[in-house]
Each structure stands twice: as C-alpha cells, then as structure tokens.
Amino acid sequence: MTTATAEAQASTAQPAGVGRIARVTGPVVDIEFPHDSIPGIYNALKTTITIGDRSTEITLEVAQHLGDDLVRAISLKPTDGLVRGGEVRDTGSLITVPVGDVTKGKVFDVTGEILNAEPGEKIEIAERWPIHRQPPSFDHLESKTQLFETGIKVIDLLTPYVQGGKIGLFGGAGVGKTVLIQEMVQRVAQDHGGVSVFAGVGERTREGNDLIHEMEEAGVFDKTALVFGQMDEPPGTRLRVALSALTMAEYFRDVQKQDVLLFIDNIFRFTQAGSEVSTLLGRMPSAVGYQPNLADEMGLLQERITSTRGHSITSLQAIYVPADDYTDPAPATTFAHLDATTELSREIASKGLYPAVDPLTSTSRILDPRYLGADHYRVATTVKQILQKNKELQEIIAILGVDELSEEDKITVSRARRIQQFLSQNTYMAKKFTGVEGSTVPLKETIESFDAIAKGEFDHVAEQAFFNVGALSDVEEKWAQIQKENG
C-alpha cells in the first residue's frame, strides 16, 4: 500500500472490527477477523495483556493480509502474556502521534504516549497526525541552497551543512556520533532558537536519559520534542519511531511555518529493525541478510525530510558503520540521500582530536564557490591540499624520518600538523570530560584563521597551542601562557 492510500485511510477511519488471536510468534501476531471487517495495511490494532492483577494495553500494526480472513501484525510492545483466542480491536486508523506545541519538552514513545508526564498531570492533546504520510509534492519543494552555520570549525569550513538538507554522521562504535548530535541539539537551540525533534532509534537507554538531563541543564529541553524507541524495544517500534518523530517535525514545518531540526540517532538501527521485521514476516533476504525492500523503506523516510517553500526540516542522522565497512548495504543505501557526509575517524579520535571528523573523506555538495563564495572555497581547498600532501608524506617520514624531506615538504608537514590540531575544538557537551567551556566560531573568523595558518603566519607558534581551542585569539593566549611557563 502506498502512503497516499494510507493517509486517505487515516482520514476516513473504517468501522472498527474485533478479531481473535490465532498465533503468536515473538513480536509477530496472526489475527483472525470477520470477513467483512478486515483491517487495512498499517492499521493500528489494540489488545490487552493481563498478567495477575495487572493489565497492559499494547498496539500492533497490520503488516500483511494472509488470506482466509487472517492478518499478520507486528507488535510494538513485548508480547509476553498474549494467548490464542485473545480479543484484538481494530482502531480503524493508522498509528497517530500528538503534534504541535504540546510536544515540546515532552518525551514520547512510538505511539505518542507521554513518558515524562507528572503523576496526575492532565495534558490536552488537540491534534494527532498519522505517522504514514506523503512527502511534499514536487511543486511545493524549495530549490534554494543555503549554508547552515554550526559554529564548529571543521564542519563549517570543510563539510558545510545545507539548510533543509540531510546530513549523515558516519562512524564505527565509540568515535563520537552521539556526542556530536547532542552538541548540535544544544547549538541549534542556543544560536538559532529553532525547534528540534530528536528520534532515539534503537540506541542505549542510558544515552537517552543522559541527553534529557543535559538538555534540562542547558535550558533547551522546552524547545525540543523527543521520541524514543530504544535497544530493548521490539523491532516494530524501532522501525516506526523515526516516522513518529518526523511527523511531529512536519507539523512544525507545514502548519507553524518553522525551520526544524530533526535528529535521528541511529539510522542504522532503523535499517536493522526493518531487516528483523522482514525476516519475521518471512520475506527472502537480499545482500548480507538485509531486507529486499531496503532502498524503498529508506526512501519513504528520507523523501519526507525536505524543504518546502520558505520552511525546512534539516536532518542530522548518526549512521553506525558495521565493522567500519562503508560498502555494507545499510550505510551505502543511506549515502544516496545525503547532502553532506561527516565521517568520524577512529584514527583521529585515537589522537584525542575531537570532533574526530576526517577532513579528507567528509564531503558536502555545497563545497562549491557558487554557494560559498570564492574565499571560503579557496581556503577549504588549500587546507585539504595541505592535509592530503601531509598524508602522502607520512610513508616517507615513517621510513626515513622528517629530516630527509625537502625544506618545502617540511613546511607543509609543519603547517598540516597545526591545521590538524586547530580542527579540534572545545565543545559544550565535552565540558564534563575536559573542564573547558565550549566555543562557537563565526564562519568568517574560521575562514580567516585557516587562511592565516595555511599562509604560514603562525609557523612560529608551537603545535600544542592549537589543540582544543576555538578562535585564533585563544591560540595566541595559550601560546603566551606556554612561553611564560617555559620561561
């Protein structure tokens, strides 16, 4: 079924039927309905599990029609306690989530239940939208290309983000994807004053808890809606939670006419959940065991993340790369949809340089003088050339040592090392680890600073003065302190 059909179905809810559970296989439940009231694909079903004196209502989503009045549904909660013959009610509509200002400062699950409501607190929900929706039509799309300034030097200079674009943060385990996403949540609220929607897809519950506390401390929680479907949730929840968050973001864009930031951590878990659901539904797997409709599933999500006339959803997606293999179908399928890719390198992280962005492999479609201006493009290209030349010289240095290089190459290596150190930056989220306050560097200052280093104006300053600082004024201050300590 197309999303168009699904949306139409949501707006004209069918008469609800009542069915009986025929079979339960993990999160997959087969349900028999009367012949004249079989629920449509994507319809939300409800049933109640009673264990002892405790009753819990769970939601299921119809995934297949099996024939003989049977439908196959995926449960969004654990199915422990479900029994054959149990009653299941068709809601007559798709899964819906609350939208609007009521979502700010709230934590939701995939079905729109509020997880952080105070005991006895009554929350008025005026409007709910179905999570399966059509992407904006072609004539409503915004063709303007505009830089999204982050205040992080390595990103703004070498892999600039697009307003209303899709940005991927690639990296293996433990290289700083989640920390960088948390940093961006804080910067957007502080510097742009915009609304953020955060989707926690199949990540650690501890990280979600830490994020909420950090946002409360930073005073940005009230401008953010959070939707979580964590690692311990069934695959149906992890597959749908990104759509729930995206629906909330679409309301801010389309109805309130705001620019929105959508954070998804982690888009790989969305693909992984799709693979699990596909296997549970009995589909034949494709390459590396992924679902045969991998590209289609990814497209349905990514096509809805876009700019409409005057308003945008800018999305930042953390993408786990299994075993650091970029040819894996999951990250490879995501690449096709992105406007900018920020690759986080284990090698750079091991040197203690954060954000651990690889300046040579990270890319952006707007790294072009038509979009950025001649100065920005010239400096970015020069910096990349110096870093590339340094990378090529490392083999010679490893065998023969620095002394065997020509004078020109020695200068290149020296400047490259200063640039590498200066690409690191003290971030707000890392303050608890480093004790150093975060910094925001304006784009103009970033361009001028790297231009000066590339031209050799700071060749006299020791490398360590460039480490983990914001602006060049911080470098000069640190250098004066080092000289003072050394007498």
From Swiss-Prot:
Keyword Translocase carried by entry: yes
Chain residues that bind ATP: 171-178
CC per GO annotation: plasma membrane; proton-transporting ATP synthase complex
Record Pfam families: ATP-synt_ab, ATP-synt_ab_N, ATP-synt_VA_C
Catalytic activity: ATP + H2O + 4 H(+)(in) = ADP + phosphate + 5 H(+)(out)
Compartment(s): Cell membrane
Family annotation (SMART domains): AAA
Class of enzymatic activity (EC top level): translocase
CDD domains xref list: ATP-synt_F1_beta_C, ATP-synt_F1_beta_N, F1-ATPase_beta_CD
EC number annotated for this UniProt entry: 7.1.2.2
Entries under InterPro entries matching the protein: AAA+_ATPase, ATP-synt_VA_C, ATP_synth_F1_bsu, ATPase_a/bsu_AS, ATPase_alpha/beta_chains, ATPase_F1/V1/A1_a/bsu_N, ATPase_F1/V1/A1_a/bsu_N_sf, ATPase_F1/V1/A1_a/bsu_nucl-bd
GO molecular function: ATP binding; ATP hydrolysis activity; proton-transporting ATP synthase activity, rotational mechanism
Keywords for the protein's UniProt record, in alphabetical order: ATP synthesis, ATP-binding, Cell membrane, CF(1), Hydrogen ion transport, Ion transport, Membrane, Nucleotide-binding, Translocase, Transport
Membrane-topology descriptor: Peripheral membrane protein
Family affiliation: Belongs to the ATPase alpha/beta chains family.
Cited function: Produces ATP from ADP in the presence of a proton gradient across the membrane. The catalytic sites are hosted primarily by the beta subunits.
Self-association state and partner proteins as the record states: F-type ATPases have 2 components, CF(1) - the catalytic core - and CF(0) - the membrane proton channel. CF(1) has five subunits: alpha(3), beta(3), gamma(1), delta(1), epsilon(1). CF(0) has three main subunits: a(1), b(2) and c(9-12). The alpha and beta chains form an alternating ring which encloses part of the gamma chain. CF(1) is attached to CF(0) by a central stalk formed by the gamma and epsilon chains, while a peripheral stalk is formed by the delta and b chains.
Protein name: ATP synthase subunit beta
Organism: Leifsonia xyli subsp. xyli (strain CTCB07)
